[in-house]
């Protein structure tokens, strides 16, 4: 749910909340209003109770990191789409592959200007409890290499849309854009 809330906040800041291909990009909210909107949605989640408080503990910790993650996601998206007139938000699309009996359904996170990017969020990870019972958390750095599954996903998106793929890795420590310019796995030969 936290990754969804990061995307919600970024969508609001870019005018892509409630996106539809017919309406397109709307008037954006300012970043603080976008963060408040995403946090309000986040607070609608009720942590599960059957896991000895693990989900509730993560819920509280993740809430503290969401504002920075949203801000980094917006910075990364603005960086990636610099000079692009119109950005499209997430919507359901279909791709007909002649070798398959059914169409492939895909949800591109963001696209425009002949390129597309998929948002990937990494949340803080819990450290073991200290002797006094308290816990600290480790904030990961944004990833620099995609997983095999992420490369396969981007290959399908590229084949379906013809738009050059990229990945936006976001943590509360920053963001990293991975594309064909800085990662061999994202080049045409590997996709």
Task: Go through the PLM ranges and name each one.
Residues 1-107:
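Metal-dependent nuclease catalytic cores that hydrolyze phosphodiester bonds in DNA/RNA
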Residues 89, 100, 146, 156-191:
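Metal-dependent nuclease catalytic regions and adjoining charged, substrate-binding loops involved
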Residues 80-83, 112-116, 160-166:
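Secondary-structure boundary elements
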Residues 10-12, 150-161:
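An active-site-proximal "capping" alpha-helix that borders the catalytic cofactor pocket
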Residues 5, 149-152, 189:
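Generic recognition of stable, solvent-exposed alpha-helical segments in well-folded globular domains
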Residues 93-153:
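Non-catalytic protein-protein interaction segments used by genome-maintenance enzymes to assemble
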Residues 36, 136, 164-166:
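Ser/Thr- (and often Asn-) enriched beta-sheet segments in non-cytosolic proteins
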Residues 16, 20, 123-125, 171-174:
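Short loop/turn segments at secondary-structure transitions that flank enzyme active sites
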